[in-house]
Design a protein with these regions (language model features):
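A compositional/biophysical signature of low hydrophobicity enriched in polar/charged and small residues
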Residues: 1-152
Length: 152
């Protein structure tokens, strides 16, 4: 219950959380601290609606690498991670090697990102961009079915 509740509402007070869990406030706080210490809770954050801030383009970029041009896969991972426009980056198996989720104000700034940043990275063999037309599901939580709440 603790993990699921915190994913849905990270701003819930410890008092309200303890009532939901059915244990005392100090015991609830101790469990949350143990979950943080164990790395189960990685961070508390705010989810921003980027469109309301004028970032209207979400691009999904599929990339394949030219391994003969790479000095290291770790190096290219660092280059992708350093790009401010990239909000998610996954190394994947299958036809492509990476998928990037890119946020941009408009198609012009997206093109500038592609032309001035992404295509300048050595070792990329293939780039294919797709654009999100509609977000059907953007669930940033995963509801866990844990009988004993991770025994923390």
């Amino acid at each position: 219950i603790i993990l699921n509740t915190l994913q849905e509402n990270g701003k819930i007070t410890n008092s309200k959380l303890s009532k939901l869990v059915g244990i005392s406030a100090p015991a609830t706080l101790e469990r949350v601290k143990r979950l943080e210490s164990a790395g189960v809770i990685a961070s508390f954050t705010v989810i921003v609606d980027h469109e309301k801030l004028g970032y209207l383009i979400t691009g999904i970029v599929n990339l394949s690498l030219n391994l003969s041009q790479l000095t290291s896969v770790e190096g290219i991972k660092k280059e992708f991670a350093a790009l401010d426009e990239v909000v998610e980056c996954y190394q994947i198996s299958g036809e492509n090697d990476f998928i990037l989720k890119v946020i941009s104000k408009n198609i012009k700034t997206y093109a500038e990102f592609m032309n001035n940043k992404l295509t300048k990275i050595d070792g990329i063999r293939f780039i294919k961009s797709s654009f999100v037309i509609d977000s059907v599901k953007e669930n940033r939580t995963f509801l866990f079915d844990l009988d004993e709440e991770y025994k923390m």
